[in-house]
Amino acid sequence: MPEDYEKYRMGSSNESHQKLVQPISSSISKSNKKTKHQTDFVQDSDIIEASSINDEFGEVKRDLKARHVSMIAIGGTIGTGLFISTGSLLHTTGPVMSLISFLFVTTICFSVTQSLGEMATYIPISGSFAQFVTRWVSKSCGAANGWLYWFSWAVTFGLELSVVGQVIQFWTDAVPLAAWISIFFVILTIFNFFPVKFYGEVEFWIASIKIIAVFGWIIYAFIMVCGAGKTGPVGFRYWRNGYAWGDGILVNNNGKYVAAFVSGLINSIFTFQGTELVAVTAGEASPRALRSAIRKVMFRILVFYVLCMLFMGLLVPYNDPKLTQDGGFTRNSPFLIAMENSGTKVLPHIFNAVIVTTIISAGNSNIYSGSRILYGLAQAGVAPKFFLRTNKGGVPFFAVAFTAAFGALGYLACSSQGNKAFTWLLNITATAGLISWGFISVSHIRFMKTLQRRGISRDTLPFKAFFMPFSAYYGMVVCFIVVLIQGFTVFWDFNASDFFTAYISVILFVVLWVGFHFFFYGFGKDSFKMSNILVPLDECDIDSGVRDINDAEFDIPPPKNAWDKFWANVA
């Protein structure tokens, strides 16, 4: 074990902590030559001392509490995907295949979050896993992956804005859709310029509403299944007589259900996207809070996703015409359809208010996540350095503004092809997110190999992931396979529009990867050196940014009352 690392582990040197916050290892770009066209980026030679960057640009602040971190993770996931896009999934695949799809994605999500937890608690830096790919895979791959992941959250913000007005139109269409989009566009953008502690506090209370609403709906659904509704006991009524599997795809082919399952995966993945958000907060939260949040991911997934999908499939038949009728996205929400079918007249309006709150919260998280990813990319030297600038509250304001600008995509909903635009944006964000998930697993594999090369036991880490390294390989392989096959239906009746909708994120990633590679290394011999294509294990930086999780500054105050204890266990 290296001497500096041993000093860090023992907490014997305060000076070592100053060294360990350097944003990136100089080893990643030993062979880089600073050319004229690279001067707008932070180069490794420019960031030898983190303090010099902080003096010039400022830095983010660790003002997020444990409860904030957990709620941000929940706030970014319980949103449009769960409440709205699950209707399309249920209609396409039927209740059983929808549930299987959710369980399958749960295994991927568990693998990815475990990998991320082990890395982010050890090196808690902003936009963490975007920097991990840069450090342990390659600088160009890290740049491409980071920018694609940022792009997915920027586009998702536009998607949330495109939906929020249509959800409000469940009550009235007196106000134009563009007006609602503009109102929330401005409010959410301005709010993200406030210090992160305000963001964390608001997100905590909004996410609390989500949790209470989802728990309440699950209890309501159970009661309706048992017979409290106007239709009497429902039980597994909609799973019998062929209802369980839906119509599938390829009606005249024995593989129609497999095809439906693969086709529905993209909706499932979009619903789960955001469970990794807890690691994005790493630079502004206690590593102990991260560890606690990661450990509860499986509980959240099983309750908020799998149970909800189970009850939706029990209460709403896959061929219910309301799942596909026109009249706004909320009309297609299985949550509201279940209430309407059960004869509960008031609850749909109450729950629609929850959905509005949920989408606003998700949009808020989109800007936060995207801006911190962009900040992390600038730290890693793969984004313009002005994205490092922070205001007095520690908010990277240029990164916030640039991310929020993509909310303008929400105005696509005002066109006659609003539903098509929603599907287009959903596919882009889900596929981009899945690519990022795959590279989280790749980074973790490289991280574990580097630890092994140095003789460092994973038992000494603040958080040790389960089922490793097999789980990381599983996550990597499955993510990349799904990315490649998720759009297979476009090849049956090929047209360019559907092809690009399905694979634009893949194309963008490859273009970014190749483009950044030649940008950093030029077109000479350096660009073809194996050490520039894949960082050698001996040069992988696992020292910069390491923090001692036992430091007093990371202490988490114990719950003061029953209310605090409840949230400590749930969130």
Swiss-Prot record:
Q: Which GO terms describe its molecular function?
A: amino acid transmembrane transporter activity
- InterPro entries (UniProt xref): AA-permease/SLC12A_dom (IPR004841), Amino_acid_permease_CS (IPR004840), APC_YAT (IPR050524)
Record's subcellular location: Membrane
> What protein name does the entry list?
Lysine/arginine permease
Where would you find the membrane-spanning parts of this chain?
A: 69-89, 93-113, 148-168, 174-194, 204-224, 260-280, 297-317, 343-363, 393-413, 422-442, 465-485, 504-524
Which residues does the annotated region (Disordered) include?
Answer: 1-36
Pfam families the record matches: AA_permease
Predominant place of localization = membrane
Q: Which UniProt keywords apply?
A: Amino-acid transport, Membrane, Transmembrane, Transmembrane helix, Transport
Q: Name one GO cellular component term.
A: membrane
Q: How does it sit in the membrane?
A: Multi-pass membrane protein
**Record's function text:** High-affinity permease for arginine and lysine.
Q: Which PANTHER family match?
A: AMINO ACID PERMEASE (PTHR43341), ARGININE PERMEASE CAN1-RELATED (PTHR43341:SF4)
The Swiss-Prot or TrEMBL record describes its family as follows: Belongs to the amino acid-polyamine-organocation (APC) superfamily. YAT (TC 2.A.3.10) family.
